[in-house]
Amino acid sequence: LASEDIGNADPQALVVATAAAQAVERVGMPESQIILSQAAAYMACAPKSNAAGNAIFAAMDSVKRTRTTVPVHLQDAHYGGHEKLGHGIGYKYAHDYPNHYVKQQYLPDEIRGEKFYELSDMGYEKKLKEHMKFIKDHAD
C-alpha cells in the first residue's frame, strides 16, 4: 500500500509502514494493535498516487519492446582507452550546473522522448512536479 497506492504523494508512508512492521516484531500482540491502527490510519489519510508504479511498468515494457544501447557519452569512462571508443566524451556532470540540472540526452536514441514518470498533482508529487518544471525552465 505505501509504495503501490501512495508512492511519492507521501514518501513518508513507506517509512511509517516499515517502522510499524519493525515495532510489531519487537512489541508483539496484543499491544501491536495500536501500532497497526496508527499505521493503517496514516495510510488511509495519506494522499494517493500510483505514478511510481506506472513508471517502472512503462520502463520495463519499453525495455521488452525495444533493443537499446546506452548513449555513448553516458558509457563508462573510468578506464584507459575510453576516449578511443568515445565513452564519456561530452558528458555533462549535473552537479556542475545551476540547480544541479543540465539538459542532456539520457535515454537511448531508440526511445528518446519517451516519458516514464508522470508526476501527479497529489501531495508531495505536486511539489516535485513544480520543482522539475522550475529547474527545466532555468536550465542552461
Regions found by a protein language model. Give the residues of each.
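Terminal-proximal interaction/regulatory segments of ATP-powered molecular machines
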Residues: 1-101, 108-140
